[in-house]
Amino acid sequence: MATGHHLEMPLQVAVIGAGRMGGHHARIYASLPEAQLVGIVDTDISRAQALAQQYNCPAYGSIEALLAACPDLQAASISTPTIYHRALAETLLSRNIDTLIEKPLAPTVADAQALVALARSRQCVLQVGHSERFNPVVRALSKHRLEPRFIEVHRISPMRFRSVDIGVVLDLMIHDIDIVHHLVRSPVASIAAVGVAVIGRHEDVANARIVFADGCVANITASRLAMKTERRMRLFSPDAYVSVDYQKKAGVVIHKTANQAQLDIVRQQLAAEETPDLSNLDYTELVHVDQLEIDDQEPLKLQLQSFLHAVRTRTEPAVTGEDGAFAVDVATRITQAIAQHQRNDQPPSVLGTV
C-alpha cells in the first residue's frame, strides 16, 4: 500500500455527505485525537455548512472544491446515497486517498468490483461500513469457535424513509449477509428468495435462504414495514447453540457439557430398542450456558478507529472491499431471485431461485 503518512500527526480526514450518517462520522472524527476533520462535503452547501459549523471545519459544495482546498487530505468517509458511491470513491482513490464507504459498497456488482480493483491498483485502504461487525454482540461472538450449520436472522423495523433509493435487501439485509459470511467463510452454493414492494418500487420485505458450499444454511428475513424494531440471530452448530439480540446487546451461547461420559450414557439409552424413561433427567446438566461478555462501546466509533488504524499502519482493514463486494453480489442475487419469483407469479410458498 502507498506510504508516506506522518505517523505522529493526526490524519487529515473529510466526510462526503452531510446527512444522518455523515453527521455521525463528522461527530466521531472530530472527537478522535488521531484525526483532524478538515472538511465536510455536500451538494446541499447549506447542510454542509450547518454540520461543519458544529465541528469547526470548512464546508464544501463539491468533492473537487474539497480536494483543491485540502491537497494533503489522507482519508475520507463517503456517506452519500449509494448511487453516488462509485464516482466519489474513484475520485478519491485515483488521488491515493484512503476511503471508507458506507454500506452497501456500490449499487451493482460491477461497480463494487471496479472499486476493489482501483483500490488495489492504487495501494489504497478501502474499508466498507458494515458497522454491525463492530457491534459488541458480534465482537463477543467472534471469541467463540463456532462451526455454523444453520443460521436464522430477523432484522425488522418501521419505515423511516431513509435509503429509499435501494430496497430492503441492500438497505438492511446486507448487514446480515456480511455477518453470516464473516461467520461461515464458505462460497455460496445457491440462493432462494421472496420479497414484496409495498411503498415504493423496491422491495420492502424480503426473505432469503442461502446455502453455502460447506452445507451451512442461512435463513434471513428483513423488513422495513414492521411495527417494531427487532434484530436477532440464532445459530446452530454441532457443539453449540447461539442466540443474540443486536438491539438489546445481549446474547447466550449454549455448549454441550464437558462431561462427555454423561452424554455418552444418554446417547446409548436413546439408541436402545426400548425407549428409556428420561423424564427425571436434568437437561441443564448436559449443557453449559455462557452469557456473552458484551461491552457498551459505540460500533461506529470502533469502525472509524479501525479505519484510521488501517490507514496509519498500511494494513488490511477489518471489513475489506472484497467483503463489501461479496455482500453486494449476494444481495444482487437475492433481488434477482425475488424478481424471478414475481415474474413467474408463483404462489407465496414457492421461492424464486438463482
Residue locations for each model-derived region?
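A contiguous active-site-proximal alpha/beta segment in oxidoreductase catalytic domains
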Residues: A106-S163
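Contiguous beta-strand/loop segments that form the cofactor/metal-binding neighborhood of enzyme cores
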Residues: I177-Q260, E293-Q297, K301-R314, V350-V354
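Mid-domain beta-loop-alpha active-site segment that forms a flexible
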Residues: G129-P136, M159-S190, E203-D204, G324
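Short active-site oxyanion
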Residues: A35-G39, Q74-A76, V125-L126
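N-terminal Rossmann-like dinucleotide-binding module
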Residues: M1-Y55, V180, T353-V354
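Beta-loop-alpha module in the N-terminal Rossmann-like domain of NAD(P)-dependent dehydrogenases
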Residues: H25, Y55-V116
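Hydrophobic residues in well-ordered beta-strands that form the structural core
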Residues: G61, I101, L126-V128, V244
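C-terminal helix-rich "cap/oligomerization" subdomain common to oxidoreductases
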Residues: M1-L7, A65, A75-I78, L292-I294, ...
